[in-house]
Amino acid sequence: HGLSGADTYLEECARASEEVIKQYPNVHPKYDELFNSEILDGVTGILLYKAYETGQLMHGLTRMVRTGESYIEATKDAVDSYLCTDGRPVSTTTSRYGGDKNMYGQFRDRDYRLYLTICPPYMVKKENGPSTADWKYTDNAQDREFIDLMATISGETYHRLPSSNFKGFTVQGQPHFKNMNWGQGWNASQMGFWVWKYYNTHTVATNANGVNTTDAPLFRVGEVMVNYAEAMCELGKFDQTAADKSINK
């Protein structure tokens, strides 16, 4: 921004970040496990976390995400900010990204962290009413595209589709709007982008008294790597070596 002395702070950021990266050179390969694990002690890339324990310190976030009480959602701008699988933004990508003509195209070939933060689109059949766990595939192949994809990138009790509420009732689809919800008032949003970052099915969600005990990451080496990359870029020193130390992890 043309301020004097800025390089002093950028140089220090790069130096300090590199020291941390030397001690913690890798990130955890399963992004969603960082936010949905009962124990973060020893997990790759975790620098500091907050531990929760039954009878001592608990929270209700995991349950809330799977109820109608959650109003955590994203904007279209937030969705568009995620890169595509070729490393390019949506404005210049050569991937299969399909723009915003429909939700399937909008989510296609995107950074997997998008899928693990904002629920991808899908649709299933619910033949026995909204308050049941049963479901079937529709006759439209697109409706199962992300059901199949999530089964390959997320663990069985993490971000699998179709999603379910705190009682195990299967949600018919996403986008799932609060004011047009197929008789299912849960796992819904106002704008169509339901945030499910803290969603999992291995944590007990039937108790409304805030008894969840998944640990919370406070500082991750991934954040340090981004700081390093940005500082090196501002200093005009970002090259392949810097990329391989940071954003290519």
Please report, for each region that a protein language model flagged, where it lies by residue.
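Detector for Asparagine
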Residues: N26, N36, N102, N128, ...
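Active-site beta-strand/loop architecture of penicillin-binding DD-peptidases
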Residues: T170-R220
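An aromatic- and glycine-enriched ligand-binding surface/loop that stacks and positions planar moieties
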Residues: G2-T170
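Extended, hydrophobic/aromatic-rich amphipathic alpha-helical segments that build helical scaffolds
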Residues: H1-I21, L48, L114-C119, W196, ...
